[in-house]
Swiss-Prot record:
This protein's encoding gene: rplL
Pfam family, one: Ribosomal_L12
Transferase keyword on record: no
Protein's UniProt name: Large ribosomal subunit protein bL12
Job of this protein: Forms part of the ribosomal stalk which helps the ribosome interact with GTP-bound translation factors. Is thus essential for accurate translation.
Length: 123
């Protein structure tokens, strides 16, 4: 019996965030593709030559330092993950905490995580 699209979507909806990340990685590996968003074509002319200020950032946890429990709490607060998912994410450092966030949110999250004892990078 073949699964319908609705069956697959319902199964994915019941998965945890970490399970979905693992599923995406497995699909990328199996089919030889990436889940990256295609970049929009660049505008031509001298205006395009001007350096653009980056407006979206990825908040990456480089390490959790000495205060792992505090970092896990900060990650849970920022992402809404459950305790186990947040712990697994922190322990898998370097790991992306949030992707495609604006500069203000990225800076605020970086500050909170660093106050909790983590080493954080903005990319």
């Amino acid at each position: 019996m073949a699964l319908s699209k609705d069956d697959v979507l319902n199964a994915i909806a019941e998965m945890s965030v970490m399970d979905i990340v693992e599923l995406i990685s497995a699909m990328e590996e199996k089919f030889g593709v990436t889940a990256a968003v295609a970049a929009a074509p660049a505008a031509a002319g001298p205006a395009a030559a001007a350096a653009e200020e980056k407006d979206e950032f990825d908040v990456v946890l480089a390490s959790f330092g000495e205060k792992k429990v505090g970092v896990i709490k900060a990650v849970r607060e920022a992402t809404g993950l459950g305790l186990k998912e947040a712990k697994d994410l922190v322990e898998s450092a370097p790991a992306s905490i949030k992707e495609g966030v604006n500069k203000a949110e990225a800076e605020e999250l970086k500050k909170k995580l660093e106050e909790a004892g983590a080493t954080v990078e903005l990319k």
